[in-house]
Amino acid sequence: MLWLDQYRPKTLASLDYHKQLSERLISLSSTNEFPHLLVYGPSGAGKKTRVVAILRELYGPGSEKLKIDQRTFLTPSSKKLQINIVSSLHHLEITPSDVGNYDRVIMQELLKDVAQSAQVDLQAKKIFKVVVINVADELTRDAQAALRRTMEKYSNNIRLILIANSTSKIIEPIRSRTLMVRVAAPTPEEIILVMSKILTAQGLEAPDSLLNNIANNCDRNLRKAILLLETVHAKSPGNKQLIDTGAQLPLPDWQTFIQQVGDSMLQEQSPARILAVRSMLYDLLSHCIPPTTILKELLSFFLSKVDTKLHPYLIQAAANYEHRTRMGNKSIFHLEAFVAYFMKVYAMLQLGMELPSY
């Protein structure tokens, strides 16, 4: 088992940072007027861990007895949609954005079924069920409108906990009907504290320089920090003392692969190279790397490699194609369009040609 899962806190009281927030959530969970929640913050800040701890606070250990089901829904055009549902007797966890623009169907049918069914466990502390919606900021506006109607109609039977990276894409009617809980990214000091506790539990030691290096290069993402720490340990599994070699921390395989895609685009700009890059992009998508993440990583890579004259063009193009990937179904088309655009403006700059207006 990964350290990330092995040492994940299970209760609000055992969380290592944002103590005031934990106390407030404990207080909320003890009342019968538990509200709908919108839990937001950057990746790796601890949103999901806190939501799982809230469920335990509401229902006790029974919320951890999970099963995974696959359910099929039918769209008005008779297209079949399949979605995985993680559930206990007390709650459901779904990611409707997995089905793209059909997420409205999931929201309408599933939430209606849950809201109209009674609580199965008669000994449960709360009479309502909780529905956890992951990546809520990726929901389409139609799905969010359906969600708003459900919140109004079935508020006695269900409570919604929405998890999002940002509130900017959540419509105002939902924001106004939820208690917004911001989970800020941990500070480097808090990340070092968590890593030190894990090392102590493992019977390991590490120099301060290594912990500082990880904490300062993990983008304040605790998940990434713990994975990096375990990666360092895996390179010398027999040693009780982790060694700081002073070398650059290893990047995840997918991130290294995206950099290889960027290098390939810098080396040659041609139709043949676009086809080669397209194949590499397919590999990333097939390994569940989100298209928006691919765009952001490519943009970050190019901004560090190319002339600053190109920066506004690339930023504008990345924003444009990110929007298109969210609106459409075939993300590979928009990724490939960004690749072609980059090759065009980069080749024009190399040849000394006048760049187009953006």
Swiss-Prot record:
The keyword DNA-binding applies. It comes from the Eukaryota. GO terms for cellular component: chromatin; Ctf18 RFC-like complex; cytosol; DNA replication factor C complex; Elg1 RFC-like complex; nucleus; Rad17 RFC-like complex. GO terms for biological process: DNA repair; DNA strand elongation involved in mitotic DNA replication; DNA-templated DNA replication; UV-damage excision repair. InterPro entries: DNA_pol3_clamp-load_cplx_C, DNA_Rep/Repair_Clamp_Loader, P-loop_NTPase. The keyword Cytoplasm does not apply. One of its GO terms (molecular function) is ATP hydrolysis activity. It holds the Pfam family RFC_C. The elongation of primed DNA templates by DNA polymerase delta and epsilon requires the action of the accessory proteins PCNA and activator 1. Heteropentamer of subunits rfc1, rfc2, rfc3, rfc4 and rfc5 that forms a complex (RFC) with PCNA in the presence of ATP. Two other complexes exist where rfc1 can be replaced by either ctf18 or elg1 to form the ctf18-RFC or the elg1-RFC complexes respectively. Belongs to the activator 1 small subunits family. PANTHER family: REPLICATION FACTOR C / DNA POLYMERASE III GAMMA-TAU SUBUNIT (PTHR11669), REPLICATION FACTOR C SUBUNIT 3 (PTHR11669:SF1). This is Replication factor C subunit 5. It comes from Schizosaccharomyces pombe (strain 972 / ATCC 24843) (Fission yeast).
